[in-house]
From Swiss-Prot:
Lineage, opening ranks: Bacteria, Pseudomonadati, Pseudomonadota, Gammaproteobacteria, Enterobacterales
UniProt name for this protein: Curli assembly protein CsgC
Functional summary from the UniProt entry: Plays a role in the extracellular assembly of CsgA into thin aggregative fimbriae (Tafi) fibers. Assembly may also require CsgE. Tafi are thought to be assembled via an extracellular nucleation-precipitation (ENP) pathway, and possibly also via an intracellular non-CsgC-dependent pathway.
Gene Ontology CC terms, in alphabetical order: periplasmic space
Record keywords, A-Z: Chaperone, Periplasm, Signal
Origin superkingdom: Bacteria
Family the UniProt entry places it in: Belongs to the CsgC/AgfC family.
Matches recorded under Gene3D superfamilies: 2.60.40.2420
């Protein structure tokens, strides 16, 4: 049992903290790494709606510490019922570490 807990604690993970007020969603991508990393962080958001499609991309290199949740950004998005929005977060050190996660995890 303790081995399973230790393995879970050591794994790298990306999560999204999300709050909603009406059509406004606030999305905070968060990463926890098992080892410190100088990583390339990319956030891509894609919106399809009645007014067409838009893409926004942010890239930066960050020094990320180990074993603590790090909030990488804060995005506020107005999503109506006609819109489809996805946010993809990628964290990579260009070698052995490559994490990618999409929000929402299933299609809206």
């Amino acid at each position: 049992m303790h081995t399973l807990l230790l393995l879970a604690a050591l794994s790298n993970q990306i999560t999204f903290i999300t709050t909603q007020q009406g059509d406004i969603y606030t999305v905070i991508p968060q990463v926890i790494l098992s080892e410190p990393c100088v990583c390339q962080v990319q956030i891509l958001s894609v919106r399809n709606g009645t007014w067409g499609q838009s893409h926004t991309q942010q890239k930066q290199t960050l020094s990320l510490p180990a074993n603590q949740p790090i909030e990488l950004s804060r995005l506020s998005v107005n999503i109506s019922s006609e819109d489809s929005v996805k946010i993809i977060l990628t964290v990579s050190n260009g070698q052995s570490l490559h994490l990618s996660q999409q929000w929402p995890s299933s299609a809206r």
